[in-house]
């Protein structure tokens, strides 16, 4: 509060007969971008807990403003209300886990809270900027220090530094991490399914006593020159629109699960049967000579693998509006690979090395018609089906 008083003597009592002027309140609100950032975290399955040195009433007001708690929720715990760590059992421990806001918390209590959540199976990220935050930043699975106002001790103890001191950056970083993880999965599944198809193609042709449908140098050409470009283009994807609407990945599970290996094998088998069917049609129905049939088989495998990259989109996304279709690098890679495949077919020196010949009009019609079969199957599955979970 503010008040005034006129005195004739400087030694007069300063606290009597004052004229009240008014109350002065200091407001230090959270940044406007924090609330939507917290909402994004919650949608992404990330639980946000506020630990502050402010008084409980102040912490509760900020928590309501940020949407962490409702006005009816009075669940704010002060440090003095928390029992010693070794005494926390049963209902007391459950109350701690349900609490969204902690006020007047001591540094040692921060360590205890982190330990409680970690033992509950949570991956804990901790933000901080002061020297007192350093032990908690070090103990957390991910310590996040402030880059502008953070102390050197806090920054050295952290795993990550927010250069802009902005909470909004955290969900952005989480999204980038999820996109990278998703792109790695796509890269591995695509490249391995293409390689599996090449292995199965030679294996099945051998046990069926068919002529070799693809030559060793042609396989090497596909691996080194063509399918590698779409694979790398997948790593530049921007992720699906619902990337932050999914729960976090279980850190105890491998990046490529048994289900992914199964899907890879299924894709490889579909690609193999398509190429083998094309080769059989060329030899037995169209009665094309072996040299030209091998070229048709080689080109079918090349185009099958190129169209197959479009099957790497996520489930239940739209055919023409998904993270793969709008990836401009995918289309550049497909265009470049088609150009290289045409060079391998028609460029005199290269075609001689790879033993390719002009497939002719009927050959091209067969190639283009058969090569889209795996794409059609994949698109139907991704649109109307769901991810296989055989080994969960």
Give the residues covered by each predicted segment.
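Hydrophobic alpha-helical segments characteristic of transmembrane helices
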Residues: 42, 52-53, 187-195, 362-366, ...
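Cytosolic catalytic headpieces and adjacent flexible linkers of membrane translocases
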Residues: 1-116, 120, 134, 148-149, ...
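Basic, alpha-helical nucleic-acid-binding regions used in initiation and control of genome expression
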Residues: 137
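C-terminal transmembrane module of polytopic membrane proteins
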Residues: 299-392
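Membrane-embedded transport module
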Residues: 70-125, 140, 145-316
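Conserved SAM-binding loop
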Residues: 48-52, 126, 143
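Membrane-interfacial loop-to-transmembrane-helix junctions in polytopic alpha-helical membrane proteins
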Residues: 14, 255-259, 286-293, 322-325, ...
């Amino acid at each position: 509060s503010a008040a005034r008083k006129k005195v004739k003597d400087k030694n007069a009592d300063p606290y009597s007969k004052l004229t009240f002027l008014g109350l002065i309140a200091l407001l230090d609100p959270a940044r406007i971008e924090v609330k939507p950032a917290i909402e994004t975290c919650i949608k992404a399955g990330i639980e946000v807990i506020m630990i502050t040195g402010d008084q409980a009433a102040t912490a509760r007001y900020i928590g309501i403003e940020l949407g962490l708690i409702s006005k009816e929720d009075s669940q704010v715990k002060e440090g003095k209300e928390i029992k010693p760590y070794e005494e926390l059992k049963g209902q007391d421990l459950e109350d701690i886990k349900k609490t969204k806001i902690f006020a007047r918390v001591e540094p040692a209590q921060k360590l205890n809270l982190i330990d409680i959540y970690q033992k509950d199976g949570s991956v804990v990220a901790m933000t901080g900027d002061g020297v007192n935050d350093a032990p908690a930043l070090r103990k957390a699975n991910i310590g996040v220090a402030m880059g502008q106002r953070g102390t050197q001790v806090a920054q050295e103890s952290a795993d990550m530094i927010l250069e802009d001191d902005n909470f909004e950056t955290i969900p952005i970083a989480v999204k980038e991490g999820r996109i990278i993880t998703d792109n790695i999965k796509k890269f591995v599944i695509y490249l391995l399914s293409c390689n599996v198809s090449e292995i199965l193609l030679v294996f099945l042709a051998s046990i069926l006593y068919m002529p070799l449908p693809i030559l060793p140098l042609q396989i090497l050409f596909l691996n080194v020159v063509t399918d590698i470009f779409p694979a790398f283009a997948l790593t530049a994807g921007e992720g699906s629109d619902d990337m932050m609407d999914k729960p976090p990945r279980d850190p105890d599970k491998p990046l490529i699960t048994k289900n992914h290996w199964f899907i890879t094998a299924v894709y490889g088998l579909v690609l193999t049967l398509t190429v083998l069917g094309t080769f059989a049609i060329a030899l037995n129905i169209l009665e094309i000579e072996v040299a030209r049939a091998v070229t048709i088989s080689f080109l079918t495998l090349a185009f099958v693998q190129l169209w197959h990259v479009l099957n790497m989109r996520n489930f239940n996304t739209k055919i023409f509006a998904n993270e793969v279709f709008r990836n401009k690098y995918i289309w550049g890679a497909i265009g470049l690979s088609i150009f290289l495949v045409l060079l391998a077919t028609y460029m005199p020196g290269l075609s001689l090395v790879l033993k390719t010949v002009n497939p002719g009009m009927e050959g091209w019609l067969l190639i283009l018609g058969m090569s889209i079969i795996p794409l059609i199957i994949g698109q139907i599955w991704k649109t109307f089906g769901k991810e296989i979970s055989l080994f969960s």
